[in-house]
Structures are given as structure tokens and as C-alpha cells.
């Protein structure tokens, strides 16, 4: 089996849908409590964050909806649950800030990415406000106009 190339930033998976659906206001770095088979699957980049979010309950943060696919070579005596809730490790001040902000109307806490930081797995979570449909269209229009501008600049340089 060929070795997988390491991502230069150590990113394992990203939640691009969260950036599309929310205005990201604050980002936090949280540790993840994982079992052995989950770490092996993360090394093989078998993780999806598409519909994952953070649940704040009883002064703790939990990652919900994150799907880590178990490897076929994983241990047979452990029953692997790919969508189990995983505890996020944050300090008290960060938890209080998240809890107070989520209780406000329109704020949500979502997972943006999972990455390696040295030998530890970290999860980047963000506090965001939901976008309306017209906000999404406006963002798309801005992105298209920026692309057109870059193309014009690039073609102008080639003519000279």
C-alpha cells in the first residue's frame, strides 16, 4: 500500500459547508478525546465533518455528527461506532464564552476542521451566525466578481 502524502498544514478534514452556511465570528482550538481505532482512521483521513456541530451541555462540549469510518484492520474485540459523540477539551473561560454566545439568538457552534498539532488531534470549532439565502447569493456574487477581476489582470499581463 502506498503511503499517503501529508498535508503541509496537518489538516485531516475540513467542513466547507459550515463556512458556506455561517458567518464565522470567533474560532477556538479544542482537543478531542478519541479511542485507538479512531486515531488510526484519522491517520488514514477517514473522517467527515459535513453535518457536525458542537453541543454544549452541563459545562462540557461534545462533538456531534462527526463520522469517523473504522478501518477494516481495526481491532475486532472493540465495537466501533462511527458517529459516537466525542468530548471536546476546552478550558473553562472558553466554555463560558461559547455557552453565553450560543444562548443568544442566531448563534451556533460548529466544527470547521480536524488537524494534527504535533502528535495530538485538534478540532477547530467556531462560533457563527447563520446566513440567510440572500447572504449566500451575495457572497457568491462577490467571489465571482473577484475571479473575473483576477482573470482580467492575468490576461492583461499576458498581452504585454
From Swiss-Prot:
A Pfam family it matches? SmpB
Which residues constitute the signal peptide according to the record?
Answer: none
Q: Name one GO cellular component term.
A: cytosol
Q: Which GO terms describe its biological process?
A: trans-translation
- Gene name, per UniProt, is smpB
Q: Name one GO molecular function term.
A: RNA binding
Q: Where in the cell is it found?
A: Cytoplasm
Region entry Disordered, spans? 131-160
Q: Does the keyword Cytoplasm apply?
A: yes
UniProt family annotation:
Belongs to the SmpB family.
- What protein is this chain from? SsrA-binding protein
PROSITE patterns per the UniProt record, alphabetical: SSRP (PS01317)
The entry's function note states: Required for rescue of stalled ribosomes mediated by trans-translation. Binds to transfer-messenger RNA (tmRNA), required for stable association of tmRNA with ribosomes. tmRNA and SmpB together mimic tRNA shape, replacing the anticodon stem-loop with SmpB. tmRNA is encoded by the ssrA gene; the 2 termini fold to resemble tRNA(Ala) and it encodes a 'tag peptide', a short internal open reading frame. During trans-translation Ala-aminoacylated tmRNA acts like a tRNA, entering the A-site of stalled ribosomes, displacing the stalled mRNA.
Q: Which key words are in the record?
A: Cytoplasm, RNA-binding
Q: What species is given as this protein's source?
A: Pseudomonas syringae pv. syringae (strain B728a)
Amino acid at each position: 500500500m502506498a503511503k499517503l502524502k501529508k498535508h503541509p498544514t496537518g489538516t485531516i478534514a475540513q467542513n466547507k459547508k459550515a463556512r458556506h452556511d455561517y458567518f464565522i465570528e470567533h474560532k477556538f482550538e479544542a482537543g478531542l478525546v478519541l479511542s485507538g481505532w479512531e486515531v488510526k482512521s484519522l491517520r488514514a483521513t477517514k473522517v467527515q465533518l459535513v453535518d457536525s456541530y458542537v453541543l454544549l451541555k452541563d459545562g462540557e462540549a461534545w462533538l456531534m455528527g462527526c463520522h469517523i469510518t473504522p478501518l477494516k484492520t481495526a481491532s475486532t474485540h472493540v465495537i466501533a461506532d462511527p458517529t459516537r459523540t466525542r468530548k471536546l477539551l476546552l478550558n473553562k473561560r472558553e466554555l463560558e464564552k461559547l455557552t453565553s454566545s450560543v444562548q443568544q439568538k442566531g448563534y451556533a457552534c460548529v466544527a470547521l476542521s480536524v488537524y494534527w498539532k504535533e502528535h495530538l488531534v485538534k478540532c477547530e470549532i467556531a462560533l457563527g451566525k447563520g446566513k440567510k439565502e440572500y447572504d449566500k447569493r451575495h457572497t457568491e456574487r462577490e467571489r465571482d466578481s473577484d475571479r473575473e477581476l483576477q482573470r482580467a489582470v492575468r490576461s492583461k499581463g499576458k498581452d504585454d
